[in-house]
């Protein structure tokens, strides 16, 4: 060691060197204590008791989000003590233990029995069930406000705002991989809502198998402002469509220079790029009839099922179910309205019931006083991030047929194409080409005839006929045992 110190002194004594600085640096190697690395402190390393104390200050949405971090957080965020406190604080202030039903007596008690007799997560589940039930009740109250002309809910926008409701589509490919598309544009009409989804990164059409439409709401909407797609949400399945062999299995609605339109029941329109044969956009047309119920009350795997109809049999009226229908009809192209009309006192004679249909003639070819002019040139507007267009000779039809009590009897919103008819107009008032438009679903069909007036550059509806399935009629009006209807083929027929 002495030799070592001597060498240090000799080195420090060399002329021209910074001896004092060097010696000070060397001495610091011996005098300075070693620096120990600081221990990383993170929330995951905290004791469970401390974490539970922190979690007890969080709201329900934050607790649900924490439960998705890892297994330990999930178990701690299920703590019955925390959720029982949230459940109790959510009760009406006037409620007391004695006023509550026996089922809920133990839910307010903060004693050991209410905590230890239940499995972890019990009170979380009870809290969520209670909040979701109260939310559904509050939203469904808004459905009861009806438009006197259409018989449909008139506070849909308010209900959407209260519930945080939105709609998404989920595309599933043949390998089982799902692609979620949330970005959308909404267009509200008198009786329907049109939703347009467009994206720059659609999956290849050839590998897609299904498309599912969901209504999406925050799990706890009162505590999510604004609603976040990363927060806990509820999904309500509204429709499922099969996309395999789309161009062969669906109905071609029309085309322009860029896209082709294909229709799938109920109410879906898929735009395909002509050049790439890939999806350009997806458009859903949703009728207001039971829209909120279908968007909220279903589950992620099962669609909402309306309660069974309980018709009353009228033994006095021999033509019960054949008269006093009302029709509200809208024709539009998503952004523009072409026709909005209401027709009252529609009826059908018994002799007009044939081939499994009840015929309701709305516009008669021979009665030119009821012919309807169309505003503008018929077409459906579409858009993406880059392009916009208008496919001509097609439109969206919103049909609302009310029965004699003013309740919705048959409703739909769907794209319809026009076709040039081979026959020429036999009307002296209108000389021009005739176009037809037909719609068919499981409940009936619609047939429309237009005449194109070259002089005024407009369409005129000269014929409009509804055909309602007699099977739907017998179920809705309980006509199974009516002998006077049995001879008029009130049975289900193939179209």
Where are these regions (language model features)?
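Short hydrophobic alpha-helical "box" of cullin-RING ligase substrate receptors
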Residues: 45-59, 63-77, 83
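Substrate-receptor adaptors of ubiquitin E3 ligases
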Residues: 2-36, 41, 81-495
